[in-house]
């Protein structure tokens, strides 16, 4: 069970391993909220093996409260499921949202698998260093077999990654403040565009928005091939690849607010102008 929209590689990983994704549907106008026990349990069948989530979310920026996290772990324990929690964006929460990890709970650890990485936390994507964490010995024994079939991460990358963990909390506070400013800019500008649906995300550095266009991927190609303003255009990720359900997300986009403030302002102005001109001709 995976709340959709979700990180597209989950689909690749799960299906390659012989699994089947049962998508948990969400809505843009509800901020892609999925932490509803009744809806989650309605997805569970005798074949269900796991619930997989990203918290904070990619591509939605959705954050779980501590109570919502506890509810998900309760469901996993009561139905004897794995709860796979991808926490690579854990430090990136805003608006006073406290930082939580599923590893803090003193029960259900046999059901829990945590995924973490240096790539987002320290902006060190090139290092390709991450980890699986679980107290389930059977699971870890099987994970070790996979690890032993691969060569190790480069030694220098491991040394550098270990050093990154000596970074103090002031680093993350500065990064959070900068991402919050960028998020606020993008959300403010999106809310100025008629017909756009976008709830303010509370974490990570992504957001999803529904646009007043017939097809976001077609719109994206038009922006790249036929649209420009003073030599500039704008690019984003079309929403449909973030869904397992055919036809969903066709008018949605993901925006990563990782540019400088002035570049984000310009990008959102280009998006607004592009939507207006596209709808005049389509």
Feature-to-residue mapping (PLM):
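PLP-dependent class I/II
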Residues: 1-282
């Amino acid at each position: 069970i995976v709340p959709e929209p979700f990180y597209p590689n989950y689909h690749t990983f799960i299906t390659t391993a012989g699994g089947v994704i049962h998508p948990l549907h969400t809505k843009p106008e509800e901020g892609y909220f999925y932490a509803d026990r009744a809806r989650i349990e309605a997805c569970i069948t005798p074949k269900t093996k796991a619930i997989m989530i990203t918290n904070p979310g990619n591509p939605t920026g959705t954050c779980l409260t501590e109570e919502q996290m506890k509810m998900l772990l309760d469901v996993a324990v009561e139905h004897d499921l794995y709860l796979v929690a991808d926490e690579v964006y854990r430090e990136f929460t805003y608006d006073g949202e406290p930082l939580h990890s599923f590893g803090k709970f003193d029960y259900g650890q046999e059901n829990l698998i945590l995924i973490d990485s240096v790539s987002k936390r320290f902006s060190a994507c090139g290092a390709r260093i991450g980890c699986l964490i679980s107290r389930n010995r059977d699971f870890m024994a099987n994970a070790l077999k996979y690890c032993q079939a691969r060569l190790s991460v480069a030694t220098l990358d491991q040394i550098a990654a270990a050093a990154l963990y000596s970074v103090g909390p002031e680093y993350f506070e500065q990064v959070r403040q900068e991402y919050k400013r960028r998020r606020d800019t993008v959300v403010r500008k999106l809310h100025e565009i008629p017909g756009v649906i976008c709830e303010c995300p509370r974490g990570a550095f992504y957001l999803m928005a529904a646009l007043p266009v017939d097809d976001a991927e077609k719109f994206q190609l038009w922006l790249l091939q036929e649209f420009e303003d003073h030599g500039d255009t704008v690019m984003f990720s079309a929403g449909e690849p973030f869904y397992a359900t055919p036809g969903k997300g066709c008018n949605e986009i993901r925006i990563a607010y990782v540019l400088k403030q002035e570049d984000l302002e310009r990008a959102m102005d280009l998006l607004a102008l592009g939507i207006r001109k596209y709808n005049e001709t389509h």
